[in-house]
């Protein structure tokens, strides 16, 4: 069966927002109006179509990006629902990587919020074209102009309204379309399915003319012909104006701002029109870069069915009916069921068992898919998030890897029975495969299973899934901080390992220079020996020895990070030297760093933002200071005060309850990992005593 939709008619986009901006409701309405959903699901009653895990329906937040296909005006929309809670930033990064465009949803009452900034920065990183939908315009206190201002102030983005609301709060009746210079008014019944064009109300005409002129001036800058005509006194036609706005969106010159209320069914169809008119098709974005699997040279893949197959796995989910599902974006080529694929990232073979087109919670089996498609594959064995799948025979490729932040919080889990132990192993392996920001390891000394994640909520939800989905009974320890260690100074260490008492002995001498590296540089090993002081075949033993001990640290058993080890000299013995002897020597040299390298304990520092009513400001700041917080600044947002601070993660456990109690539930906070920094000596002494 040939391709049914031209690739230029695809819109692969995501909906991104702060936690309560109404993102899931907006997605629900899109599915309803595009005819995919027969009943509107409300987050308020836990029935939203996209939020299909129990944990999401209860908490009213979106945890996993479900991918859905829908149609609007002959265009094919692949919608990726992204979570808005900061503990799930990884999901957002991962979906932005495979999107071509995005709709940023703002709460018309709050404007740009902390998580909006985070997600916006991530979208900047991946250069994702976006449009903005100011939602909840029916809420008391909603203010469109203020929201637009907050985009300019807080995101530093050029915001250009292409609509503004008619009426506000409970009297919201529609919007002014500044491209067509018409009013669009919705009937209150028929669930928002009926709307009509009217002339712009007389009392809004002056505002509309001014806003239209601002839009036109920004738009014609994108096109020389339009600019010339405009300077000559000619008003651009609707088609020319749309073409210019589209150009601006594709290069990020400005961001069109739309408005409405998804909950009250107003403004969603005009948002869909804007998605079709302004967001990119796969042909509008730069070709995808990759590395040739064999030659390791850079190659590009254009969005075309004729090019060799290249597919990126961006999400793995455990589905109760199908088993493990791998969500994939096809960048080039054609994929068919039964095909044999190469996982180029891991050099493993895979076979496509079933291929599914997902609609949030039901699925359609398909036999083939093309460039631009987002599909779910069942039956893959070794593929993980971020892996590339391709045709083993036609110029295999590795697409660029996704980068995932390191987890900062950990808890110990102990199964209650032998049966639980077995179930726990299987369940954790699946959860770790689904989510790269969640890692599982075993503490060799205590034998405990350690789970690491991005925040308390992140781990809470994993524990919840273990208990509910996998029926594992386990005891959960208190959360622990993922401390790290670093070197305080550069030091040369000369160590000789010698065991020569009859028979084959062991001999290895290493001279290694250890030095602190830049933050984020990781562990770097270098061999600078010139000549044959240590034969080449023994060098890997030196590196292996260091690799085997660095994660146990020097002070309290935490990994030593960001340092460089340079092998500068050494000695060997013709008979008694071996790879193992050099491994033992480098391990012993490493241990001498405890005395000689001035090691330091590091702790994760979180960027914390608290939004609080004025009357609790003193208590909030006092409390943050008592947690070793460093206040970075404060400003006003509406009638609330925003406090920004850096606070050690160790002092943030249980903060949500303290803040709630202190402000009678009116203050909110978000936090995310920012950097590691040395722990003050008196605190370090306590930590070392506890863990060493």
From Swiss-Prot:
It comes from the Bacteria. GO terms for cellular component: cytoplasm. Keywords: Cytoplasm, Elongation factor, GTP-binding, Nucleotide-binding, Protein biosynthesis. Residues 8-283 form the tr-type G domain. This is Elongation factor G. Catalyzes the GTP-dependent ribosomal translocation step during translation elongation. During this step, the ribosome changes from the pre-translocational (PRE) to the post-translocational (POST) state as the newly formed A-site-bound peptidyl-tRNA and P-site-bound deacylated tRNA move to the P and E sites, respectively. Catalyzes the coordinated movement of the two tRNA molecules, the mRNA and conformational changes in the ribosome. GO terms for molecular function: GTP binding; GTPase activity; translation elongation factor activity. Gene3D superfamilies: 3.30.230.10, 3.30.70.240, Elongation Factor G (Translational Gtpase), domain 3, P-loop containing nucleotide triphosphate hydrolases, Translation factors. Its main location: cytoplasm. GO terms for biological process: ribosome disassembly. It comes from Caulobacter sp. (strain K31).
């Amino acid at each position: 069966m040939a391709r049914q939709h031209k690739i230029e008619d695809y819109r692969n986009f995501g909906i991104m927002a702060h936690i309560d901006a109404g993102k899931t409701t907006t997605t629900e309405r899109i599915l309803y109006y595009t005819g995919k959903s027969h009943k509107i699901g409300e987050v308020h009653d836990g029935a939203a179509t996209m939020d299909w895990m129990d944990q999401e329906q209860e908490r009213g937040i979106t945890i996993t990006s479900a991918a859905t296909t829908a149609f609007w005006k002959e265009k094919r929309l692949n919608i990726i629902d992204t979570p808005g809670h900061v503990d799930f930033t990884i999901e957002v990064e991962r979906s932005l990587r495979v999107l071509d465009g995005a709709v940023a949803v703002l709460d018309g009452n709050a404007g740009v919020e902390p998580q909006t900034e985070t997600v916006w920065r991530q979208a900047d990183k991946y250069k994702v074209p976006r449009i903005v939908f100011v939602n909840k315009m029916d809420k008391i206190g909603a203010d469109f102009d203020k929201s637009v201002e907050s985009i300019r102030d807080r995101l530093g983005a050029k915001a250009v309204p292409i609509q503004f609301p008619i009426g506000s709060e409970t009297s919201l009746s529609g919007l002014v379309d500044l491209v067509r210079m018409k009013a669009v008014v919705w009937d209150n019944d028929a669930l928002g399915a009926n709307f009509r064009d009217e002339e712009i109300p007389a009392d809004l005409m002056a505002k509309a003319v001014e806003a239209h002129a601002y839009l036109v001036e920004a738009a014609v800058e994108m096109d020389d012909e339009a600019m010339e005509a405009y300077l000559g006194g000619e008003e651009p036609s609707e088609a020319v104006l749309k073409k210019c706005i589209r150009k601006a969106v594709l290069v990020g010159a400005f961001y069109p701002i739309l408005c409405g209320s998804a909950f009250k069914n107003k403004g969603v169809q005009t948002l869909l029109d804007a998605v079709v008119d302004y967001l990119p098709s796969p042909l509008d974005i730069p070709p995808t870069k990759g590395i040739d699997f064999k030659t390791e040279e850079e190659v590009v893949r254009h969005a075309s069915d004729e090019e060799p197959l290249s597919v990126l796995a961006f999400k793995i989910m455990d589905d109760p009916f199908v088993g493990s599902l791998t969500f994939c974006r096809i960048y080039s080529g054609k994929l068919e069921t039964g095909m044999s694929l190469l996982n180029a990232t891991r050099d493993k073979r895979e076979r496509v068992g079933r291929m599914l087109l997902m609609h949030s919670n039901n699925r359609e089996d398909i036999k083939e898919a093309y460039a631009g498609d987002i599909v779910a594959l069942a039956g893959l064995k070794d593929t993980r998030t971020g892996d590339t799948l391709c045709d083993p025979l036609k110029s295999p490729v590795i697409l660029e890897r996704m980068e995932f932040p390191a987890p900062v919080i950990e808890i110990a889990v102990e199964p209650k029975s032998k049966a639980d132990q077995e179930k726990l192993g299987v369940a954790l392996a699946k959860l770790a495969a689904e989510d790269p920001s969640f890692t599982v390891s075993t503490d060799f000394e205590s034998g405990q299973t350690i789970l690491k994640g991005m925040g308390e909520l992140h781990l809470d939800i994993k524990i919840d899934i273990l208990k509910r989905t996998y029926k594992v009974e386990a005891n959960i320890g208190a959360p622990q901080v993922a401390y790290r260690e670093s070197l305080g100074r550069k030091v040369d260490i000369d160590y000789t390992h010698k065991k020569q008492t009859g028979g084959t002995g062991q001999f290895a001498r290493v001279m290694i220079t250890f030095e602190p590296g830049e933050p984020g540089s990781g562990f770097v090993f270098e061999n600078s020996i010139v000549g044959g002081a240590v034969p080449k075949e023994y060098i890997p033993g030196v590196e292996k020895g260091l690799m085997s001990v660095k994660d146990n640290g020097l002070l309290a058993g935490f990994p030593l990070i960001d340092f460089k080890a340079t092998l500068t000299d050494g000695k060997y013995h013709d008979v008694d030297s071996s790879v193992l002897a050099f491994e033992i020597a480098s391990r012993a040299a490493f241990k001498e760093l405890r005395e000689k390298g001035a090691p330091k304990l590091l702790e994760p520092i979180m960027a914390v933002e608290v939004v609080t009513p004025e009357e609790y400001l003193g208590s909030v700041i006092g409390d943050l200071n008592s947690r070793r917080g460093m206040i970075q600044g404060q400003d006003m947002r509406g009638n609330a005060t925003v406090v920004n601070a850096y606070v050690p993660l160790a002092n943030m456990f249980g903060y949500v309850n303290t803040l709630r109690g202190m402000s009678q539930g009116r203050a909110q906070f978000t936090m995310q990992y920012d950097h590691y920094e040395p722990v003050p000596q008196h605190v370090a002494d306590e930590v070392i005593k506890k863990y060493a």
